[in-house]
């Protein structure tokens, strides 16, 4: 099965681009199509004929609805048919099982969780713009590092449960956040904000030999490496001022 991996289109920022998606290609979009749920929804409907996609950390940046409502709207629209939104969901096609989740991070990339959480709180726009519904108090608040740490733990538990379930199948994991420090560009390897971009999940790839591909986004730099039997691919478009990619070459094609 041939697929094309892409991420970080940011179509709300890259709004002068005429996108060129092949209707016969199966696309795997690893998050951050847009910061607005309706823009994301309409873009996928108009451009993607078949494939899967996950949410990125930018979903909710528009501030119009909560993250929960955005995720609900996308899943409601893309839970059936040839294009699927995966938010802790599985999609099986041919002999391949796609497991998708945003992921988030555990802030433990450097062994100093509290410090990295504080840095993320200070510098990441996620914690300024994205809103969540606080069930305990019945109020709408901004997400915080503790919120996303909770998401991460839930999402990793889901991944492992599904990997146990499908351990005799060929699996592709689709996330937005990265599963290893190896995905981080050299100039950011010692930057502690990177703990909000990647986690050390190589142990998952070491444990499950049937993961043929783990594709992700978020870091805005390409990544190509292997952990055990798993190929890790990141193929971001990024922002208009950091990418000279020919739009005709959009996506990284791989045969799985």
Task: Describe each model-derived feature in a short phrase.
Residues 24, 185, 192-212, 219-256:
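Binuclear metal-dependent phosphoesterase catalytic core
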Residues 1-4, 90-100, 169-170, 226-231:
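Beta-strand-turn-beta hairpins that frame and shape the catalytic cleft
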Residues 10-16, 34-39, 58-65, 90-92, ...:
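Active-site environment of divalent metal-dependent phosphoester hydrolases
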Residues 99-172, 179-188:
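Active-site-proximal loop/helix segment associated with metal-binding centers of metalloenzymes
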Residues 1-53, 58-69, 145:
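N-terminal active-site segment of His-dependent metallophosphoesterases
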Residues 5-7, 27-32, 51-57, 84-88, ...:
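Active-site neighborhood of phospho(di)ester-bond hydrolases with catalytic His/Asp-centered motifs
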Residues 77-83, 158-170, 203-214:
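A structural motif corresponding to the C-terminal end of an alpha-helix
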Residues 50-128:
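A basic- and aromatic-enriched beta-loop-alpha substructure that forms the phosphate/nucleotide-
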């Amino acid at each position: 099965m041939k697929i094309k991996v892409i991420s970080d289109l940011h179509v709300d920022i890259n709004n002068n681009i005429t996108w060129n998606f092949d209707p016969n290609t199966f696309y795997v979009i690893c998050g951050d199509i847009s910061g607005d749920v309706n823009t994301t929804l309409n873009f996928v409907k108009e451009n993607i004929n078949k494939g899967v996609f996950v949410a990125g950390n930018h979903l909710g940046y528009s501030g119009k609805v909560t993250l929960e409502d955005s995720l609900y709207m996308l899943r409601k629209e893309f839970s059936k048919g040839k294009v699927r939104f995966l938010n802790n969901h599985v999609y099986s096609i041919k002999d391949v099982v796609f497991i998708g989740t945003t992921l988030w991070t555990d802030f433990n990339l450097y062994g100093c969780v509290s410090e990295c959480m504080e840095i993320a709180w200070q510098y990441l726009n996620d914690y300024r713009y994205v809103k969540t519904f606080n069930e305990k108090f019945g109020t709408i608040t901004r997400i915080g590092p503790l919120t996303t740490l909770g998401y991460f733990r839930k999402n990793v538990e889901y991944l492992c449960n599904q990997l146990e379930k499908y351990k005799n199948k060929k699996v592709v994991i689709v996330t937005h956040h990265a599963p290893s420090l190896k995905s981080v560009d050299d100039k950011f390897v010692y930057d502690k904000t990177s703990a909000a971009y990647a986690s050390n999940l190589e142990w998952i790839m070491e444990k499950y030999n049937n993961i043929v591909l783990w594709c992700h986004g978020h870091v805005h730099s390409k990544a190509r490496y292997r952990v055990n039997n798993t190929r890790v691919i990141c193929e971001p478009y990024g922002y208009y001022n950091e990418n000279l990619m020919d739009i005709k070459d959009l996506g990284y094609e791989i045969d799985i």
